[in-house]
Amino acid sequence: MNAFASAPGKVILFGEHAVVYNRPALAVPVTQVHADVEVLDSPRAGIFINAPGIDLHAELNSLPPDHPIASVILKLFQRFEISQRPDLDINISSTIPVASGLGSGAAVSVA
């Protein structure tokens, strides 16, 4: 299974905290920056995550289940009832600056 996905950054123009109270907000994509995720069949046994932008190079089982990236992967397996984990290389890259307010974490999750 080989797959590639990309998601843009975002900026919230107003209402960022209003959504907590079920009120509207206005957000727009920032297409000049993006997060990319590539999933490739791996010749190695296991699921290996390579995210150089955050200095993460690890096998899924070596990460705690509440690690942000590990938890998304584990929830996907659970949601789609995948009990037999495939051998994968997951490559994550992003041009969205971390902690910039442009939604780097959300873009990686969506991609």
Give short role names for the model-derived ranges.
Residues L102-A111:
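DPxDG-like acidic metal-binding loop motif
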